[in-house]
């Protein structure tokens, strides 16, 4: 039987500003990537999001990003490897305080936005992130773009690595994500998104924006919680995966 994890970036509200449909999306996923206060989120949001994940029996992961609230962590920054490593440790530590108090563990770490996309190509940045995770707890799973520098470096270091694919994003022919500034970067057609997901899991292929087929490994599917179609996507994905006899389980269970 095919197996896959379903994750979403949640806990990205901030103060009086609400973002996403976390309360609904969390009912359908198996792993939650919780913002740690730098690109989004705040202490109260983190506390509430951890509790929501626990109530819904969803595995918890840290979602560290660049210190860029105004840009939602989607703007590239020039940082040293030492800085990047410290940034990631700091944010994992923030989430750890809430999970420790709640008596649960951090299952995984998935970088956010520009940090994620840059680390997919930049070996030095990927190494800094992977080392931060390893030094905190080598049992934590590192999540990265499938077949990227991030996953390659994590595996070399000895971490358990989850290769991630995206239901609602278009791909370039080199396996990277199409920039959000490019037309067609975000897929709004739920039927198309679901069909692509099933093909990625069963065939290990995804059609790039130029029509080429790209080989891809799919341990975990991401549905963005801030996408206006997130709830429709995740609902339809869960329904279709069941029909296709694809079991949805957490990363930890999948990678054992």
UniProtKB/Swiss-Prot annotation:
Annotated function: Catalyzes the cleavage of 5-oxoproline to form L-glutamate coupled to the hydrolysis of ATP to ADP and inorganic phosphate.
MF terms in GO: 5-oxoprolinase (ATP-hydrolyzing) activity; ATP binding
UniProt name for this protein: 5-oxoprolinase subunit A
Hydrolase keyword on record: yes
Pfam families: LamB_YcsF (PF03746)
Enzyme Commission code(s) on record: 3.5.2.9
Keyword Hydrolase set for record: yes
Signal peptide as annotated in the record: none
Highest taxon, organism lineage: Bacteria
Catalytic reaction equation(s): 5-oxo-L-proline + ATP + 2 H2O = L-glutamate + ADP + phosphate + H(+)
TM ranges: none
InterPro entries, A to Z: Glyco_hydro/deAcase_b/a-brl (IPR011330), LamB/YcsF/PxpA-like (IPR005501)
Organism: Alkaliphilus metalliredigens (strain QYMF)
NCBIfam families reported for this sequence: PRK05406.1-3, PRK05406.1-5
HAMAP family per the UniProt record, alphabetical: PxpA (MF_00691)
SUPFAM superfamilies according to UniProt: Glycoside hydrolase/deacetylase
Keywords per UniProt: ATP-binding, Hydrolase, Nucleotide-binding
Protein family per UniProt: Belongs to the LamB/PxpA family.
């Amino acid at each position: 039987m095919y197996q896959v994890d379903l994750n979403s970036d949640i806990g990205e509200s901030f103060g009086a500003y609400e973002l996403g449909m976390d309360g609904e999306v969390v009912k359908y996923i198996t792993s939650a990537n919780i913002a740690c206060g730098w690109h989004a989120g705040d202490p109260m949001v983190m506390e509430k999001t951890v509790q929501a994940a626990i109530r819904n029996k969803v595995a918890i992961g840290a979602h560290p990003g660049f210190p860029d609230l105004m840009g939602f962590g989607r703007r590239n920054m020039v940082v040293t490897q030492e800085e990047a490593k410290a940034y990631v440790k700091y944010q994992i530590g923030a989430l750890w305080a809430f999970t420790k108090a709640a008596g649960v563990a951090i299952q995984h770490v998935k970088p956010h936005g520009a940090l994620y996309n840059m680390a997919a190509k930049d070996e030095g940045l990927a190494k800094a992130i992977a080392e931060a995770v390893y030094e905190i707890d080598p049992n934590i799973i590192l999540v990265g773009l499938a077949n990227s520098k991030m996953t390659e470096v994590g595996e070399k270091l000895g971490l358990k690595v989850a290769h991630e694919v995206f239901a609602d994003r278009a791909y370039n022919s080199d396996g990277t994500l199409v920039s959000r500034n490019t037309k067609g970067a975000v897929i709004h057609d739920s039927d198309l998104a679901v069909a692509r997901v099933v093909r990625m899991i069963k065939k290990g292929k995804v059609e790039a924006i130029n029509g080429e087929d790209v080989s891809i490994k799919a341990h975990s599917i991401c549905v963005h919680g801030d996408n206006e179609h997130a709830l429709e996507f995740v609902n339809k994905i869960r329904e279709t995966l069941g029909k296709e006899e694809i079991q949805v389980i957490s990363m930890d269970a999948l990678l054992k």
